[in-house]
From Swiss-Prot:
Record's keyword annotation contains Iron: no
Compartment list: Cytoplasm
One GO MF term attached to the UniProt entry: sequence-specific DNA binding
Functional note: Required for spatial organization of the terminus region of the chromosome (Ter macrodomain) during the cell cycle. Prevents early segregation of duplicated Ter macrodomains during cell division. Binds specifically to matS, which is a 13 bp signature motif repeated within the Ter macrodomain.
A Gene Ontology term for the protein's cellular component: cytoplasm
Entry keyword set: Cell cycle, Cell division, Cytoplasm, DNA-binding
Subunit structure of this chain's protein: Homodimer.
Species: Escherichia coli (strain SMS-3-5 / SECEC)
Name the UniProt record assigns to this protein: Macrodomain Ter protein
Length: 150
């Protein structure tokens, strides 16, 4: 496993996930009967700061259809949590218009690079072009100054 599992932290994430799903109207319990489901949800709501009890609640009461989705959500959250610890692994997002993304993705594919690597390469190319243009302009001015003196 690449990322360490932190039981207390992840139990909090699981609790938040289940409460969010409940508030969105999803069935988070395995019970069909509304009163049994509400009773289980009420117990869950009282367990916010009880990580071990949250895991026990999940084992006893959670809707089996949510198991894989919750695992995926927690796995993604764990990855983001650990990546955020280091500047070089921290991720940022940008909004691109579809046509821009499409062109960037095509360029990245042709170059065999990731989108991030392609963006860095494009920035470096633009910086090099700018340096070259400045150097040429400076050489042109120096040459004109030399020719103008004679």
């Amino acid at each position: 496993m690449k990322y360490q599992q932190l039981e207390n932290l992840e139990s909090g994430w699981k609790w938040k996930y289940l409460v969010k799903k409940h508030r969105e109207g999803e069935l988070i319990t395995r019970y069909i009967e509304a009163s049994a489901a509400q009773e289980a949800v009420d117990v869950l709501l009282s367990l916010e700061n009880e990580p071990v009890l949250v895991n026990n609640w999940i084992d006893k009461h959670m809707n089996p259809e949510l198991v894989n989705r919750m695992k995926q959500t927690i796995r993604a959250r764990r990855k983001r949590h650990f990546n955020a610890e280091h500047q070089h692994t921290r991720k940022k997002s940008i909004d691109l218009e579809f046509i821009v993304w499409q062109r960037l993705a095509g360029l990245a594919q042709r170059r065999g690079k990731t989108l991030s690597e392609t963006i860095v390469q494009l920035i470096e190319d633009a910086e090099n072009k700018e340096k070259y243009a400045n150097k040429m302009s400076s050489l042109k001015q120096d040459l004109q100054a030399l020719l103008g003196k004679e």
